[in-house]
Amino acid sequence: MKTKYSYYNNQLTLIHQGKIVFLKGFIFRKRNLGKTLFFDLRDVSGIVQLLVKENNPQYDKIALIKLETVVQIKGQVIERINKNPDLPTGDIEILVSHIEILSEAQTLPLNVFQSQESLEETRLKYRYLDLRNPEVKHFLIQRHHITQSIRQTLLKNDFLELETPILSKSTPEGARDYLVPSRIYPGNFYALPQSPQLFKQLYMIAGFERYFQVARCFRDEDLRSDRQPEFSQIDIETSFLNQDEIMSLTEEIIVDLFANIWKKPLLQPFLRLTYQQAFELYGSDKPDLRNPLKITDFTTFFDTNTYSQNIFAGKIKGFKVSKTAFLTRRKLDEYQLFFSKHFNLKLFSFVKKNDKIIGGISQFIQDDSFLKNEEICFVVSGKKDIIHKALGIFRTKLALDLSLVDTTQEALLWIVDFPLFETIQEDLSPPNRLYSLHHPFTAPRDATILKSNPQKALANAYDLVWNGYEVGGGSLRINNHQTQELIFSLLGFLQEEVQNRFGFLIEALKYGTPPHGGIALGLDRLVMLFTKTNNIKDVIAFPKTQSAKDLMLEAPSAVNQEQLNTLKLQLKCNFN
């Protein structure tokens, strides 16, 4: 609580001119003009300029103050001669009469004012200094505002903010678990939750009906620019709402965010595509619709006779673009290498000039009306699933190379009607073994085909995609034990394994379970998108490196033998 003479920096304006104020903060920048000293004082609200004149009895002492020293100052608000329109306090400055050093800073390992220019390793090791940079701090302040907006939307819809345990049980959710050994039960382990999935379903069984929390989740998986081993999600579960109602609620959350964070309107309802449509049009289940390229079927324009069947092994699909001048021979060779190396596919390209098709397969084109002059066409042929996946990746690359993405727009859409199961052919497990595309608690759209044709089953699942990022995923859940046990059986779980790992859930489903479903929104990704950064580490206070290390804490680290003995653990290998 501030005293009546104290202010945050950004509260001060010309209406305070002549007032004596007390301010506290960090010395951010300083300039010595001989008979006058100028300092920038930074607090959590912003920056204000301090003026120290030569007649100040502390002048010599103040001149020696190092950057990032924490001070308290007393001074008078005066009008600034050279105003700074880029600062909220740019019309005023503080004529300092007294300064007290609260904590002196040593020589800094990085320049706080320009910390983004330091090596990432240095920034992460001294993250508490990096976070002093106002631009870096802005990411976390926005994170707060985003979280608060979501919370307010849910509270006005009668949701309860409830917690779930961190020490949990290992369950299959698609990634490796972080395990915590038990001292009391030697040889047994807790698992850090990959999500609060089962607990939030138990809340519904307990009759709470509307739950949410800002949940911490942990997944031991390979990292990338938008993924960390621990992350936050807005976890939501409801009873008695159908899929459309949950999606509508989620849209309300996002619309409120656009209004509160960007002061922009957002139209509802969002576009919806089925999983099949998304792959056939864009080659991805999380397409960036700011990219105008769509996969087109050109098969009917080709003469697929016996001879050409040696070249075309199925449907002929691809893209056509008009920016031919930007595509060099080297770039075309790079594209061909991509398809051959990663997908064992042959990429064909041809261009239309002066009403004539030029390219290696022009003799097979029986109708060139699909192509305009100066347009280039890229096509591949093969099995549908393979060419869609390949073209989806190529679509992103081609749009990036040709600057086709309209970055002034925001593209949100739903992907629905996912398959309930998938098969992973590369796996060493038995062929055609089924795996849950989302998780094994997702309700099927039609449970009657589970026994006869489970591969054709669709899921009551929905993903929210924003500019090519999956920012949310949810589903309706199974609410009877018979269907849940059948799903486990189809996934290859033995009865004993089901009982050991999910017996509590099967038991709970027997005592009256409301129809329920929910969604989890990736908070880190949402903040990343709202702050227009490409690196998720920017929006996390203390992130890990790409190799899952905390450089500041030097974690993970070895523990001493006494700790291992207490847990009755013995290391199999010495990795030091």
Swiss-Prot record:
Residues 197-200 are annotated as: Aspartate. This is Aspartate--tRNA ligase. Catalyzes the attachment of L-aspartate to tRNA(Asp) in a two-step reaction: L-aspartate is first activated by ATP to form Asp-AMP and then transferred to the acceptor end of tRNA(Asp). InterPro entries: Aa-tRNA-synt_II (IPR004364), aa-tRNA-synth_II (IPR006195), aa-tRNA-synth_II/BPL/LPL (IPR045864), Asp-tRNA-ligase_1 (IPR004524), Asp-tRNA-ligase_1_N (IPR047089), Asp/Asn-tRNA-synth_IIb (IPR002312), AspRS_core (IPR047090), GAD-like_sf (IPR004115). ATP binds at R219, D220, E221, Q228, E470, G522, L523, D524, R525. PROSITE patterns: AA_TRNA_LIGASE_II. L-aspartate binds at E173, R219, H438, R477. It catalyses: tRNA(Asp) + L-aspartate + ATP = L-aspartyl-tRNA(Asp) + AMP + diphosphate. GO terms for molecular function: aspartate-tRNA ligase activity; ATP binding; nucleic acid binding. Belongs to the class-II aminoacyl-tRNA synthetase family. Type 1 subfamily. Keywords: Aminoacyl-tRNA synthetase, ATP-binding, Cytoplasm, Ligase, Nucleotide-binding, Protein biosynthesis. Homodimer. It comes from the Bacteria. It is an enzyme of class 6 (ligase). GO terms for cellular component: cytoplasm. The gene is aspS. CDD domains: AspRS_core, EcAspRS_like_N. Transmembrane segments: none annotated.
